[in-house]
Amino acid sequence: MKRIYKLIFCVIVMGFLDSGCGTAYKVVMDQRNVKTQAQDEKIELTIRKKLADSDQVKLFDISTYCFNGNVYLVGEYDVSSQKGDAVKLAKQVEGVKSITQYFLPKKAGDHCGTSDNIELAVKVTANLVKDKGISSTNIKVKSVQCNIVLLGLVGSKKQITKAVAHAKSVIGVRSVKSYLKVF
């Protein structure tokens, strides 16, 4: 029970930091100019709205990220057609240059649930924040079925290598997929 309370606290803190408290800091620390950041945010929100309005795709199963017009769709699907539907909806959005997808089929009886995914993402993020040699505010961490996906723009290949190593060091992580790019 104590673990659940810790987890809920971490989720609330992460949401608070992500929603506004850290926004000004993130804008300043981001490698992209403010206009590009705004365009990317608009693309993300537009895709999320399209996913929410869709009868075929489940919004909460897919996360959307955008960096310099390059979109990343990350999540799970019940039936294979949901992947194509999500990509088709994302392609309709103005400003999208490319779409990269990381989808896993939902597995009945998988022992990695929502709380496990949240816990792993929080632990990986904490490892990244502790390392002052990494621009952690520029890295998004998503866990899907206990597989970590790293996304964002960083300053060097060394930062990418370190970020992947930090993610792999967390107990319970099944695999790490990096979509990190050097800005």
Residue map of PLM features:
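N-terminal targeting leaders
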Residues: 2-6, 16-183
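Classic N-terminal secretory signal peptides
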Residues: 11-12
